[in-house]
Swiss-Prot record:
InterPro entries: ArchSynthase1/Queuine_TRR (IPR050076), TGT-like_sf (IPR036511), TgtA (IPR004804), tRNA_ribo_trans-like (IPR002616). Binds 1 zinc ion per subunit. This is tRNA-guanine(15) transglycosylase. Disulfide bonds: none annotated. GO terms for molecular function: pentosyltransferase activity; zinc ion binding. Zn(2+) binds at residues 277, 279, 282. GO terms for biological process: tRNA wobble guanine modification. Belongs to the archaeosine tRNA-ribosyltransferase family. Pathway: tRNA modification; archaeosine-tRNA biosynthesis. Substrate binds at residues 125, 194. The keyword Nucleotide-binding does not apply. It catalyses: guanosine(15) in tRNA + 7-cyano-7-deazaguanine = 7-cyano-7-carbaguanosine(15) in tRNA + guanine.
Length: 489
């Protein structure tokens, strides 16, 4: 089965999409819970009742299992797992990253994954550790690409979707080039691999650089899977970068360790006096009861998975409403490392602007980071297309008397962080749908970028800015050729 990927809605680089084939449909973005047949805390059938549309399991574990190997070969994964959604299999690369070797070849794992009727199959790529030196990364990437192309030659593309993993360590040029080669080779499902160590050590800024480099090389039509991303606190950030699917065993691993997941971090269950969640597990138990329950691990896994699935829906709604930046901002303020990742992503705002939608439901100013959002970048690009008269007034106040404007050929108002706008744009996005608090220095500086752009494209105009006295020195410093007057003069 070759899955097709259709993009339905977008915000920033995030997409709501649909993976479909042979009657199976997966809405994206989505989470693929990891299924270990030997440690089945939540049966896949029960997951499906919770809204899970796709899962991932490890083909290498099945191939080595006396209990499950023959069942999977005889009945197929869908019957063995009792799950009729999309099933993806990992080749054994996870074991390769943990143990350094696996007793299976690339051709063997492709053949086995097809034999057990996996929907999405993965070649035996080498998940090079992010801190590996470039020479090692290049050598292992070369082996990975050879294996991917070997898999492409031998795979049954009519009945299976072959994934093309994007490796390349921390080197953006290698990630980008790999993504480009995979897209040119026709791959339409590409996981970004070997990033779990970055997430485990909270290196989100580096994660952003890796993902953005890979995305730069990949075709926009490619469905992008972020291997091993399983904590709900970072789903919004990952989706904003353009990741469509995630997989993780975190829901179960955290439960085994007694950790309780939330969208802003995790708690050890024995530290909680109250359960801040309305899921059935939390409504039906106090923190003490849950901690002392003989079924604690399973119940905690149920909670963790429900929290993760709810966050996926929250991200989808944010995309639909055009407010994904605000959800990213909210989530990334839960930890300094996530905030670093958020700020790093904003450094790609020019690239993201080209992918973002043009109009949105609203713009809420939430701090300095809002000044670098794509809506602001796009407005600064647009403002250069406006025409200014020979004598132009830019007023920081909307309340000016007609006699104060009579000597000017054109009048613009000022709304930071966007900048100058004519009265005709008052009700249009983003001017009319943006909410900002009292002016602050950073938003004024950013708004002045818009003024500078208007001046640049209207070189014959003489500009006068009227503002409160508190801003005069700052504006004179940023725009030294502009005449600055006090409001009311």
């Amino acid at each position: 089965m070759t899955l097709s990927f259709e993009i339905l809605e977008k915000d920033i680089a995030g997409r709501i999409g649909k993976l479909s084939g042979q009657g199976k449909i997966v809405k994206t973005p989505t989470l693929l819970p990891v299924i270990n047949p030997h440690l089945n805390l939540i049966p896949p059938k029960e997951m499906q009742e919770m809204g899970v549309e796709a899962v991932i399991t490890n083909a290498y574990i099945f191939s080595r299992s006396e209990e499950y190997r023959e069942r999977a070969l005889t009945d197929g994964l869908a019957k063995t797992l009792d799950f009729d959604g999309v099933i993806m299999t990992d080749s054994g690369s996870f074991q390769l990253s943990v143990y350094g070797e696996v007793e299976i070849t690339n051709a063997q794992t492709i053949a086995f994954q097809q034999a057990i009727k996996s929907d999405i199959i993965v070649p035996l790529d080498i998940p090079t550790h992010p801190d590996s030196p470039r020479e090692q990364v290049e050598q292992e990437l070369s082996v990975t690409m050879d294996r991917i192309m070997e898999a492409k030659d031998i795979a049954d593309h009519e009945h299976h979707t072959l994934a093309g993993p994007v490796q390349g360590g921390l080197f953006p040029d290698l990630r980008e080039e790999t993504g480009r080669r995979l897209s040119e080779a026709g791959f339409r499902f590409c996981p970004i691999g070997a990033v779990v160590p970055l997430m485990e050590s909270y290196r989100y800024a580096e994660l952003v650089k890796v993902v953005m480099a890979a995305k730069r090389g990949l075709s926009p039509a490619v469905c992008v899977h972020l291997f091993g991303a399983g904590h709900p606190s970072m789903f919004a950030l990952a989706v904003a970068m353009g990741c469509d699917l995630f997989d993780s065993a975190a829901y179960a691993l955290y439960a085994k360790d007694g950790r309780y997941m939330t969208t802003h971090g995790s708690y050890h269950l024995n530290e909680l006096s109250y359960l801040p969640c309305p899921c059935p597990v939390c409504v039906g138990h106090t923190a003490k009861e849950l901690n002392e329950s003989p079924d604690r691990e399973r119940l905690l896994a149920m909670h963790n998975l429900r929290v993760s699935l709810a966050e996926i829906n929250r991200v989808r709604q944010a995309i639909r409403d055009g407010v994904l930046w605000e959800l990213v901002d909210e989530r990334c303020r839960s930890h300094p490392a996530l905030l670093r990742g958020y700020r790093t992503l904003l450094g790609y705002n020019e690239e993201l602007t080209a992918l973002d939608r043009e109009t949105k439901r609203r713009f809420f100013y939430r701090g300095d980071e809002s000044c670098k959002r794509t809506e602001v970048v796009r407005y600064h690009q647009m403002v250069g297309r406006l025409t200014a008269g020979e004598r132009t007034l830019i007023s920081f106040s909307r309340h000016i008397k007609k006699k104060q404007t009579e000597e000017y050929d054109s009048v613009f108002y000022f709304k930071p962080p966007f900048g100058p706008f004519p009265a005709e744009l008052t009700e249009t996005f983003p001017i009319g749908q943006s909410e900002i608090p009292d002016f602050d220095e950073e938003m004024i500086k950013t708004g002045c970028i818009g003024i500078a752009r208007l001046m640049e494209t209207n070189p014959d105009s003489h500009f006068t800015i009227r503002c409160r006295p508190v801003w005069k020195d700052l504006i004179t410093q940023i725009l030294p050729t502009v005449e600055v007057q006090d409001e009311g003069s």
